[in-house]
Structure formats: structure tokens, C-alpha cells
Amino acid sequence: MAAFPSRDLPAFLEHEAKIKADPSAITRTIVAGGGVVGSIGSWEVEGERDVGFLIGRDHWGNGYATAALRAFLDIDLHRPLHAHVVDHNVGSRRVLEKCGFVLDHSAHEEDVLEHVLVLTD
């Protein structure tokens, strides 16, 4: 969702380690067809609660992200809940919108246009 180009694996792994070390974080593995297809979680960042998900490329377009986010929203009842998605990640933005998130604002982050969507209820 956020901008982690494949060449920036160390930054992504550092981000994941921080989330897993955060006692406020809620994380889940997304399993389908007997295998792991991705992960989803939420955490605190600068006084806001953020949510993010990652689906393996081989599993895109199968509805796993939408199903996982809908189920996750029943687990994490924090509101408002924010999600950051880069402009070119149309699929993730559609998942968020299907689950009730609305655009809060857009801004350039490190030369990438990023949208922040929010779920308030």
C-alpha cells in the first residue's frame, strides 16, 4: 500500500520489525487454499491508528485483501483508522473504499503521490 519498491527491501523489513515490536500492533496472517497469501495489521503512528495489508503478487485479484480487511475490521475496533496508499496502487485503494474508507487527503511523500484514506465508523 505504502511505497516500498522491491529494491528497498531493508526499509520494508525495518518497517515490519517495528510493527511486530509494537505492543499496540495487531497482526494477522492471511491464509487461503491451504497456504499463506499475505498479511494484515494495524499499529500506532504519531497518534494515529494505521492499517496495512500485503498480498503476494500471485494472489492478486482473488478478493483476499477485501475479505481479510473486512474480517480485520471486526477485530480492530479503533476508529478512526487510517490507510496510506500510493497513487499507482489502484487495487489497494479500491479494497479500502469497498470496506468504507474515504479519501482524507493526498500528499507527495519522497517523490511519490500518496493518498490517506480514513474509516471513521
Model-derived segments and their meaning:
Residues T66, H88-H105:
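Conserved active-site alpha-helix within GNAT-family acetyltransferase domains
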Residues M1-D58, R70-A71, I75-H84, H88, ...:
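GNAT-family acyltransferases
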